[in-house]
Amino acid sequence: MEISMMESSRWKKILPELLAVILCLGIMCVGISLKEGYHMDELLSFELANARYNPWIVPTQPEGRLAKFVREEIQGDSFPETVSNLTETVKDVLQNRRNSKLLSYKADVYEEPVWISAEQFRDYVTVDGDDAFDYLSVYFNVKDDNHPPVHFMLLHTMSSLFGGTLSPWLGCFINLVCLGITLWLLLRLGRQLADIFSMRERGRQLGILAVLLYGFSTGALATVLLIRMYGLLSCLCVALLSVHVEKWKDHGFDRKNKGLIAVTVLGFLTQYFFLFYCILLAAVTAAGLLCGKRTRELWIYVRSMILAAVIGLALFPFAVADVFSSGRGTEALDNLASGFSGYGARLLSFAKIVADRTVGGPLLAAACLAGVVLAVTAGWHKYQEYRRDGAEKAGQNVGPNAGILSLLIVPVIGYFLLASRMSPYLVDRYVMPLFPLATLLLALLLCYLGKKLSEVCGWTEWATGICLIVWIMAVQGLRLAGYDGEYLYRGYGQQEQLAEEYALLPCICVYAGVGYYENLPEFMHYDSTLLVTAEELADRKDVASVQSLDRVAVLIKPGVEESSVISVMQEKYGLEPEEALLSEGVHGDKIYLFVKTSENVKQE
């Protein structure tokens, strides 16, 4: 009976926090249910995760070299046969090096784009029984990309659990779990920071404010909806901060650093932008430990971070090439080396993104101004102490607050400055880790102001807390209701249904760049698909494979001149547009149904 009462009392204590987290996750689930389509990078994530040893879709090479080798030389009729083939291959590579069968193997490369079947497209982005839980394939795929493997392995796990399925829920569920962990970490940080800043009685309030500010933000929704590694990255940045705050508070950097090392390694293996935050946080921590004369902690902390770097590079040595010699890596480094040219405009663009995705420009600007005023006031008081009591006594009164504030603020500002300079595009994904960190700082400021308000007006902690919570839910709820729809791709479901309706027909996708990735779900329905540029369609030598068609769906991507495609289909292939199936899709696509002309039928 007594145990039951204790359990009931414990649940009552955490009920407000639990309700806040559940409410936020419930809202995110509604958002996921509204997602219909994908950004091309999201579908690239599915391909890197699930296409067996085949990292790219190439119209002239549907099956990659390594994929062909694995299918023909490694995969056996039984597991022992597969192991035997793999063993022989390893021996051959070790003995013959460049002359080994693996390294001299050639893929089937065609002179011009070939028809790719619906089954092949399904194999690109989904998992069946033969390639489920094949993490070695994921590892080999991402070594040719510019990202480390952890998120892709998680996505492959979800796809393996739900074989043959391509659904937003597979990727968004990972982000949803990461969001849940992030919200729990914000609650934990609330208690940690309230204890440090002499607001222990407001620890729960601080955590709940941070949870609602972030969990009700459009930034959290965008992070959950985007099936990339940024939800996991955000979670790991907050986890790293929580570990640092706890160890700073408890003087614990000299013991039990396995969790610190694990979070650091996972972050490195998730996204290289993690290094922005990690290195800055480590530098501030090391400086704080040095200034605080915590020498033993400093050396063990440095040793732990070096060990984390060694483990990360040992697990994924391709990271060095990704950062320093890959296309995306050199682009980022070139951006950094370009100095201040255009930097002001980039800073303003990313500042607007952070404001829009957190609490809005006016509120964030007011919070920053209030923070500056408080910092100046504190600095002035410290200066007065210095003049009155001398440097030694003034230094003794600094306490842990300055160090913790540095841990909270400096890495956030540094990350923002670096991401604004080095990001390839002016989009929200690159600053997503800042959203929970910025809302945590705002929650800390609101909690502090609420405490001062209680002291001045005589309000109870409960009253100020309720007022702040209601205000946050109202403001953030209205902003969330006006979400701009990014990453939802509403209307794409209708386009995919169109592909299902005409599933017996082949499809010709005329694209520019690599825009066909956005349409992979459709290509899983059409009988087969030909991926061509407008020039390739006009100059195609294999005329018969198109000319022989009675009916074909032609998908014209943005950037392609519609009239020229129609002209080529009429004059070269004898096919006339019978019906416009889609005038403008969510990605700007146009789809026509072409049929064989009567003259062409007579000639045959």
Q: How would you name each of these model-derived features?
A:
Residues 50-147, 161-162:
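Interfacial juxtamembrane loops and adjacent helix segments
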Residues 208-211, 215, 259, 264, ...:
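Transmembrane alpha-helix segments characteristic
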Residues 157, 185, 212, 216, ...:
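Specific aromatic-rich, kink-prone transmembrane helix
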Residues 2, 241-260, 264, 276-310:
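Perimembrane helix-loop-helix junctions
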Residues 470-531, 535:
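Membrane-embedded, lumen/periplasm-facing catalytic core of multi-pass transferases
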Residues 170-198, 239:
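Transmembrane-helix motifs of polytopic, lipid-linked glycan transferases
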Residues 41, 231-236, 402-412, 420-454:
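Hydrophobic/aromatic-rich transmembrane helices and adjacent perimembrane loops
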Residues 19-21, 262, 446-479:
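Signature aromatic-anchored transmembrane alpha helix within multi-pass, membrane-resident enzymes
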